[in-house]
């Protein structure tokens, strides 16, 4: 449409509005009210669309976050499982080594290298074996291995304790039955040296005194 046509249309519209304003003053206001309502409807429609868009974006962000958490959780779970399997394999290997060491010890074929490995395994796992409840199918075998380990660590301690007990027993016997040559008078057994028995005769006293004079 040309600019002249637009101007003509605009003039016609203004003339109609002026006429309606003079005849029906409320007509123009109604027209404006309808325009406002349309604007409000358009604004509400736009706001609703924006709200939907924001919600969609938020849901997508939440989905991405949940996916990240799920992936991270699965990764942690997988690493724990791998670590647990590695620990289990190491324990089984140590048990197998202990069985070999046990056999060699019985046969007196335990090498120096095996002895060092045995001591290392014992020092590493002794406390853990003491405090742990074993629930595997090889319970009996593991108990046997545990007993072997405990025996290896307690042999030297038992020897020292036995030696100490023997020493204390000997000291107690010596204290209870002291040497008669050093603590008793041969003439009067059971008396403390230097004390005469009750009822000693005067003759014995005088004879002892005479002997003493003759000695001088």
UniProtKB/Swiss-Prot annotation:
Residues 161-170 have a biased composition (Basic residues). Residues 171-188 have a biased composition (Basic and acidic residues). GO terms for cellular component: nucleolus. InterPro entries: Rrt14 (IPR031404). Its main location: nucleus. Keywords: Nucleus, Transcription, Transcription regulation. Residues 26-51, 153-216 are annotated as: Disordered. Pfam families: RRT14. Residues 201-216 have a biased composition (Acidic residues). Residues 35-48 have a biased composition (Low complexity). It is found in: Nucleus, Nucleolus. The keyword Ribonucleoprotein does not apply. Belongs to the RRT14 family. Involved in ribosome biogenesis, probably through modulation of rDNA transcription. This is Regulator of rDNA transcription 14.
